[in-house]
Amino acid sequence: MTARVKSRRGYDSPRRREQAAETRRKILGAAERLFCEHGYAATSMPAIAAQAGVALKTVYLAFGTKAGLLHALGDVRLSGDDQPIPVTDRPWYRQLLHGDDPQLLVRTAARQSRVTKERSGDVLRIIRQAAVTEPALAELWDRIETEFRAVLAGIAERLDALGSLAPGVDATSATDLLWTLNHPDTWYLLVRQCGWTADRYEQWVGETLSAQLLGV
């Protein structure tokens, strides 16, 4: 009897975890749609629960607060998954920092900028706007910007170590250029407001970085 109970619990546990993860994804997707359509302030937790098709209590149990929900949404959209792995520990970034081809490094950085912004650009815009009135989100935005610059500084330092930076460009100024060209605000202006395609944005970032950082 005891063995059967233990076996059933062991069998059900992964299933319950997957169900919980699926519910979490549904809530995040619903929140993203409503935040993008109506804005952070005008979106209520009951509206998110209704959009996700779950009980309001479920939303609060999963995320605590609306700010906590947006925080979780930002983390997932930035990383592309729900694994708590920093960018600096992700395989694509570690491989980037060990590359010896500066042109490939710059092109990969441009490609990754496109992929990340397509996934997270709108959510980052919402976080930045909400940070004006939400202290917890202001802290989140500061953390995002700090980590973002650190990631780009790693790329600049690698180019510097390869001796590939153009005359007059050091690691600090290279970081400034990477920061400006890859910033979510730049993506938003060009893609969302000016109507650029993702291909055009990626090409422009890559070509501009090559010209400004490598002098080619």
Language model regions located:
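Residues in the recognition helix of alpha-helical DNA-binding motifs
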Residues: 62, 72-73, 155, 204
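Helix-turn-helix
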Residues: 26, 30, 34-68, 72
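Hydrophobic alpha-helical connector segments
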Residues: 66, 72, 83-118, 175
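Amphipathic alpha-helical packing segments from all-alpha helical-bundle domains
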Residues: 114-128, 135-162, 172-176, 207-214
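N-terminal intrinsically disordered/low-complexity leader segments
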Residues: 1-22
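Short, basic, alpha-helical segments at the C-terminal edge of helix-turn-helix-like DNA-binding modules
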Residues: 45, 74-81
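Hydrophobic/aromatic-rich alpha-helical bundle segments in the mid-to-C-terminal region
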Residues: 160-208
